[in-house]
UniProtKB/Swiss-Prot annotation:
This is Large ribosomal subunit protein bL20. GO terms for cellular component: ribonucleoprotein complex; ribosome. Belongs to the bacterial ribosomal protein bL20 family. The keyword Ribosomal protein applies. NCBIfam families: rplT_bact (TIGR01032). Binds directly to 23S ribosomal RNA and is necessary for the in vitro assembly process of the 50S ribosomal subunit. It is not involved in the protein synthesizing functions of that subunit. Disulfide bonds: none annotated. The gene is rplT. The keyword Acetylation does not apply. One of its GO terms (molecular function) is rRNA binding. GO terms for biological process: ribosomal large subunit assembly; translation. Pfam families: Ribosomal_L20 (PF00453). Keywords: Ribonucleoprotein, Ribosomal protein, RNA-binding, rRNA-binding. It comes from Cronobacter sakazakii (strain ATCC BAA-894) (Enterobacter sakazakii).
Length: 118
């Protein structure tokens, strides 16, 4: 029976993992066994954090809108409720952007929300 030599395949697999672990600290970028574990864990973190990123940005937008709304004398929840009643359909990402970069326009939106609540 012919002898099966698999050195090329194993080396290619190791090279692939070590390439993915490039930039990691110490043995995590040099030793295959440690690098493999680090790459697997990094993948798990990346998968989890792609979902968490969406939540975190929404939290950030809400915090910015709340701060700007309170400067205009209304709470976040009342502001959003007023916008819904005034049938203003602007998502939180754009509202946060307006709150940071265009305070005059945001104040106009607050007045519109207050009018809808009254």
């Amino acid at each position: 029976m012919a002898r099966v030599k698999r050195g090329v395949i194993a080396r290619a697999r190791h090279k692939k993992i070590l390439k993915q672990a490039k930039g990691y600290y110490g043995a995590r970028s040099r030793v295959y066994r440690v690098a493999f574990q680090a790459v697997i864990k990094a993948g798990q973190y990346a998968y989890r954090d792609r979902r968490q990123r969406k939540r975190q940005f929404r939290q950030l937008w809400i915090a910015r809108i709340n701060a700007a709304a309170r400067q205009n004398g209304i709470s976040y929840s009342k502001f959003i409720n007023g916008l819904k009643k005034a049938s203003v359909e602007i998502d939180r990402k754009i509202l946060a952007d307006i709150a940071v970069f265009d305070k005059v326009a945001f104040s106009a939106l607050v007045e519109k929300a207050k009018a809808a609540l009254a």
